Design a protein with these regions (language model features):
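Non-heme di-metal
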Residues: 16-210
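Bacterial N-terminal signal peptides
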Residues: 1-9
Length: 210
């Protein structure tokens, strides 16, 4: 009797991942798409802010785009480690004026922090895939930093937006992002990354073009 033995590498690993970690795979695919959208959104917002002569707002958008890019990279790695081939298609985004863009960004960050990320973590924790839990937890904490950075500008996105924005634009600004977790800060932390506890050396200064 002839028995054909196929090497394990020929079997679709994604089937194994889906059977062992179905919720983790599902959530990681969703959040990866979300990060690709967020990065595209902030890149577009930065271009619009420059067009409207708000270089500091553009700088913030560039820093946030860099952070979202790191989140996406981490989610992509989790999926690949599980044997999946995630789609990296960049979505198109709607862009308004800078005031509207700040409003939309603040709303999106708030929804992620208060609703989506807690729900996603609750879904994947029972499967206990530690890399996915760590990546999602770090992204959640970094998104809270995004909200805080945006809130300074969003508070003035009503009738006083123009006056407040012009005042803010006169203040020099730098942004630093942790290349491990996407933590985004206006200055380097003193000891370690407040999100992933990595060394300060993991932070890079974002080239905002200002």
């Amino acid at each position: 009797m002839f028995l054909l033995v196929l090497p394990l590498s020929l079997f679709p690993m994604r089937v194994v991942a889906q059977s062992s970690y179905p919720e983790t795979v599902s959530v990681m695919e969703v959040v990866l798409k979300g990060e690709l959208l967020a990065r595209a959104r902030y890149v577009s917002y930065a271009a619009k802010a420059r067009e409207e002569n708000y270089p500091r707002i553009a700088a913030l958008a560039i820093a946030l785009a860099a952070s979202e890019d790191i989140h996406g990279r981490n989610f992509q790695k989790v999926l690949r480690d599980l044997g999946c081939r995630p789609s990296m298609e960049v979505p198109t985004v709607a862009v308004g004026d800078t005031r509207a863009n700040l409003h939309n960004a603040s709303k999106a960050e708030l929804e992620e922090i208060d609703t989506r990320y807690p729900q996603y973590l609750a879904r994947i924790r029972p499967e206990n895939y530690s890399e996915a839990i760590a990546a999602l937890t770090c992204a959640w904490k970094a998104e809270s930093q995004h909200r805080d950075l945006i809130s300074e500008l969003f508070q003035g996105s009503g009738v006083l937006f123009g006056l407040l924005a012009r005042t803010i634009e006169g203040t020099p600004v730098e942004y630093f992002v942790c290349d491990n977790c996407g933590s985004t800060l206006p200055e380097l932390p003193r000891d370690a990354c407040p999100v992933c506890a990595g060394p300060v050396s993991r932070y890079f200064r974002v080239d905002t073009g200002t």
